[in-house]
Amino acid sequence: EDRLRNNLEPDQAAREQRMLRIGKEHLNLGRLGASGAWEQAESWSAQLRRSENPLIQREALLLGGEAAAALQAHERSVAAYLQLTYFHAEGLNENQKFTAWQQMGLSYEALGRINDAKAIYSKISNELSDPQMKQAVANALQRLEGK
C-alpha cells in the first residue's frame, strides 16, 4: 500500500480524493470484520490529515476517529473528533456533528472519563434539532446518571 500512496495520481487533488476513497473502503471492510482494515483506514486518515484542503482534512478526521474507536484507541479517537469539531465545525452537517460528538462521548466513557462524556452529551443536546438524535443523547445522559 505504500507504493499506492505515492503513485496514485499525478494531480494532488485527485490523489487525495482517491486516497480518501481507499480509506473509506478500508473502513467499510473493518465494519465487515476484515482483518487489518481498521489499521489501514487509520493509516490512510493520517496521510490525508496533512492535506491543505479543509474538506479532505474534515473527511480524514471523521475516518480516523471512527477507525481509532473501532481499534479501542479511544485517546486517538477523541483527539481526531476534537480536532474535527474545533477546526471544521462550520463545515459539518448535523449528522456529522452528532456522529463526532456521540463517538467522542462513547470514547470518554470507555476511558472512564464520565464527567467529560456527560459534558459532551449535554453540549450536543443543545445543538441538535433532530428529535431522534436528541433522544439518543438523552438516553446516553440518562445511562450515565448513576455513574
What are the functions of these language-model segments?
Residues 1-147:
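Acidic, polar-rich low-complexity tracts and alpha-helical solenoid repeat scaffolds
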